Regions:
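Short extracytoplasmic/periplasmic juxtamembrane "stem" segments immediately C-terminal to an N-terminal membrane anchor
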Residues: 76-93, 240-254
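Alpha-helical transmembrane anchor segments
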Residues: 2-33, 173-254
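Transmembrane signal-anchor/signal-peptide helices with a preference for the extracytoplasmic
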Residues: 57-77, 230
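Loop-to-helix transition at the N-terminal end of transmembrane alpha-helices
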Residues: 36-51
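Hydrophobic membrane-insertion alpha-helices, especially the h-region
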Residues: 50-61, 214-222
Length: 254
């Protein structure tokens, strides 16, 4: 299911087909047994309640997706600030250790920029492995001076490095924070039920075929937008590493 949700265009296509078929099935039921006028009022009430519930669930999912997007963007900025702060605090270390820390931070920054820009899964695994090793090296680079000279000044550099490593963990957690699968399942189930009811309850008219497309298109576009915003790498809407890239240009003088 995660694979599908990471491809918003596939979500759009599948939901449009499924919802249109649901309305068509509802319309076929109506041909077998048409609604009586005495039943139509109660049926309209049920259909309206179902569509209202669908709207509420879509709004809830959209709110979650936007919240996750904003969280990922905030943690990208926090990562850049933490790396910049530690890069400056490296001057507090002995000259040899400071040079090593700055070199490692530059490499680490490059990997974080690649993490945000890369879409290839195999390349991402390489980036993750390299980043994990760099985190170990970065901590070792400040651990040695801290053990040798446990002064308040050195402690500032250690604290800054701790912020760098923690900011990466916070960013990862934000990327994993997605709209839950059960919420998607509930939305799909209610949408299918709603479209079945619409197909069953729609009266015969010349424009019936066109009307049958309206709700599936609207709901499918909503699903597409939620999936696009919620997927960190899929679709059209991504988190550009603006702050990390700006920091990289500043450090490298580009």
């Amino acid at each position: 299911m995660n694979y599908v949700l990471n491809l918003p265009l596939l979500v759009l296509t599948l939901s449009l087909v499924a919802l249109w078929l649901s309305e068509a099935i509802g319309a076929s039921f109506r041909k077998r047994r048409n609604l009586q006028e005495s039943e139509r009022e109660g049926f309209s009430l049920v259909a309206a309640a179902t569509l209202t519930l669908l709207g509420l669930i879509i709004g809830f999912a959209f709110s979650m997706a936007i919240s996750g997007y904003d969280q990922r963007r905030s943690y990208e900025e926090a990562e850049a600030n933490a790396i910049a702060t530690e890069y400056n605090r490296s001057d507090l270390l002995p000259a040899e250790d400071a040079a090593r820390v700055r070199a490692l931070l530059r490499n680490y920054l490059d990997q974080r920029v690649l993490f945000y820009e890369t879409r290839d899964e195999r390349e991402l695994r390489k980036i993750d492995a390299t980043t994990t090793q760099l985190k170990t090296d970065l901590w070792s680079a400040v651990q040695g001076p801290a053990v040798a000279r446990p002064t308040p000044v050195i402690a500032l550099a250690v604290s800054g490095m701790n912020d760098v490593l923690n900011s990466k963990g916070n960013a990862d957690a934000a990327w994993w924070n997605r709209v839950p699968g059960p919420a998607w399942g509930l939305m799909a189930a209610i949408a299918i039920c709603g479209n079945l009811l619409i197909g069953y309850g729609l009266r015969n008219s010349e424009g019936r075929a066109t009307l049958l497309l309206v709700l599936p298109v609207v709901v499918s576009i909503s699903f597409f937008l939620i999936s696009d915003i919620d997927s960190p790498r899929g679709g059209l809407i991504h988190i550009p590493p603006q702050n990390l890239t700006s920091l990289s240009r500043s450090i490298y003088g580009r």
